[in-house]
A protein has these predicted regions:
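Glycine-rich FAD pyrophosphate-binding loop
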Residues: 21-43
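Beta1/beta-strand and adjacent pyrophosphate-binding region of the FAD-binding site
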Residues: 1-12
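A conserved short coil-to-beta-strand element within the FAD-binding core of flavoproteins
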Residues: 152-168
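Short beta-strand to alpha-helix junction loop
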Residues: 57-69, 125-141, 256-261, 318-321
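Dinucleotide-binding Rossmann-like beta1-alpha1 core, especially the glycine-rich loop
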Residues: 47-127
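Conserved Rossmann-like nucleotide-cofactor binding loop
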Residues: 12, 38, 190
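Flavin-dependent oxidoreductases
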Residues: 176, 180-267, 275-281
C-alpha cells in the first residue's frame, strides 16, 4: 500500500494526516481532496467544545467510547500543545430535568451566583475541565504538523471512486483521474452518498443541521468559557472576543437555519442570566451539517481498498484524533 487518498479535510481528514505524520509513514504519496465551496466543512461551522459532559465508564458503549476519546484528546493537548485549543471550564446546569442532571453531575449545587455567572433565580450547576477550540487555528495547526508527509492537496471534489485491477480510480470535478492503492472517505455528512462502494453500509446515516449565532467584538472578560443551561449553549472566546449562542438541531440536509429556534435560545439565555447580551440582529448565523449514524455512534468501515470513517455527530473534535489512530491501526492489520 503506497498511494493513499483521503477525501475530506475537516477534523476527521486532518486528524488522519496528523496521526499518519506521528506514526509510521507507510505511504509514498498522500493526496487530500477537499472542497469547502462545494460541500461546506462542518468542522468550520461548529461550536467545538471538547468536554467530558458528566460521562463515566460502564454505562453505555457510546459513553465508554466518548470517555476514551476525551482521554486521548487530553493527552494530545498535554503532550503536543496544539495551537487553537484552550483549556476552559465547562459549566453545565439548569432548572429542568433535574433528576437527569443530578444523576449525570452529582457534584453540582443550587446557587444564584456561580463562579463567573449570576442567574435570575437559583439554578443547579456543575463544572468540569474542558477544551475550547478555535476551529480555523486548530485545523491549520494539524495540517502544518503534517508537513513531514508526502502530501498533495487538491481543492477538488471527488465525483466517482471505482476499484479497478491497478487500484482505486478516483475521478474529480475538475476532470482529473487518479489511481490510488487505498482511499479513505472522511467526507462528513457527504459520506452517506457513497453507499454503492460500502455495500450500502452507510444507508442509515442521517444529515442533521446545527446552527448557532456568532457575535464579534464582544468583551466578556479575560476568561474563555462554555455554559450549557438546560441544553442552550453560550460559548465565549476571550482570545478573539467572539460569543457563540446556540445551537439548534434539525434532521435535514439543507442549510437554511431555524431563525425562530435561535431567537428562542437567545431569549431563554437572556432571561436566565444577569448578563447583557449583544443585540440579536448583530449576530452572524453559522450553519453546519453533522452526520448522525445509528445509535449516534461513530463508525469505521472497510470494503476492498476503500475505508470510511465518520458519524462524529456532536463530538467531532473529541473523536477526531482518537478515531484517526483507530482506523490507521486497522489498516495496518489489513496491509
Ligand atoms: C452547530 C454545531 C455545533 C457543534 N458542536 C460541537 C462541539 O461542541 N464539539 C464537538 O466535538 N463537535 C461539535 N460539532 C460536531 C462537529 O463539528 C462535527 O462532528 C465535525 O465537524 C465533523 O467533521 P468531519 O471531518 O467528519 O466532517 P466535515 O468537517 O464536514 O469535513 C468533511 C469535508 O469533506 C469534504 N468532502 C466531502 N465529500 C467530498 C468529495 N466527494 N470530494 C472532496 N471533498 C469532499 C467537504 O468539503 C468537507 O470539507 C458541532 C457541529 C455543529 C454543526
Amino acid at each position: 500500500m503506497t498511494r493513499l487518498a483521503i477525501i475530506g479535510a475537516g477534523i476527521a481528514g486532518r486528524s488522519l494526516l496528523y496521526a499518519l505524520a506521528k506514526g509510521n509513514k507507510k505511504f509514498s504519496e498522500i493526496t487530500l481532496f477537499d472542497s469547502d465551496s462545494f460541500a461546506h466543512t462542518c468542522s468550520l461551522r461548529s461550536t467545538a467544545i471538547v468536554a467530558p459532559r458528566g460521562l463515566s465508564l460502564g454505562h453505555s458503549d457510546l459513553g465508554d467510547l466518548l470517555v476514551g476519546a476525551f482521554q486521548t484528546f487530553s493527552s494530545h493537548i498535554e503532550n503536543d500543545r496544539p495551537a487553537g485549543v484552550f483549556p476552559i471550564t465547562q459549566y453545565t446546569g439548569g432548572l429542568s430535568k433535574l433528576d437527569d442532571l443530578k444523576k449525570r453531575y452529582p457534584n453540582g449545587e443550587f446557587a444564584k451566583d456561580f463562579s463567573l455567572f449570576s442567574f435570575r433565580s437559583d439554578v443547579y450547576m456543575a463544572c468540569e475541565n474542558a477544551y475550547l477550540i478555535d476551529p480555523e487555528i486548530y485545523l491549520e495547526w494539524l495540517l502544518n504538523q503534517s508537513s513531514t508527509l508526502p502530501l498533495i492537496q487538491k481543492n477538488d471534489f471527488v465525483l466517482s471512486v471505482d476499484e479497478i485491477s491497478e487500484g482505486v480510480e478516483v475521478k474529480t470535478q475538475n476532470g482529473y483521474t487518479h489511481v490510488f492503492d487505498a482511499v479513505i472517505f472522511a467526507g462528513g455528512s457527504v459520506n452517506r452518498f457513497w453507499n454503492k462502494q460500502s455495500n450500502d453500509q452507510l444507508s442509515n446515516i442521517k444529515p442533521v443541521q446545527g446552527s448557532y449565532l456568532e457575535f464579534r467584538n464582544v468583551n466578556l472578560g479575560h476568561h474563555s468559557y462554555s455554559l450549557t443551561l438546560d441544553g442552550d449553549n453560550l460559548v465565549y472566546h476571550a482570545h478573539s472576543h467572539k460569543l457563540l449562542i446556540g445551537s439548534t438541531s434539525l434532521v435535514t440536509h439543507y442549510e437554511l437555519p431555524e431563525m425562530n429556534s435561535l431567537l428562542e435560545i437567545y431569549k431563554r439565555l437572556q432571561s436566565s442570566l444577569e448578563l447583557k447580551l449583544p443585540d440579536f440582529s448583530a449576530a452572524e448565523v453559522k450553519v453546519g451539517i453533522r452526520e448522525k449514524a445509528p445509535k449516534r455512534s461513530p463508525y469505521i468501515k472497510n470494503h476492498g481498498k476503500c475505508w470510511w470513517i465518520g458519524g462524529y455527530y456532536k463530538n467531532g473534535y473529541s473523536l477526531g484524533y482518537d478515531w484517526a489512530k483507530k482506523i490507521i491501526g486497522k489498516m495496518e492489520i489489513h496491509a
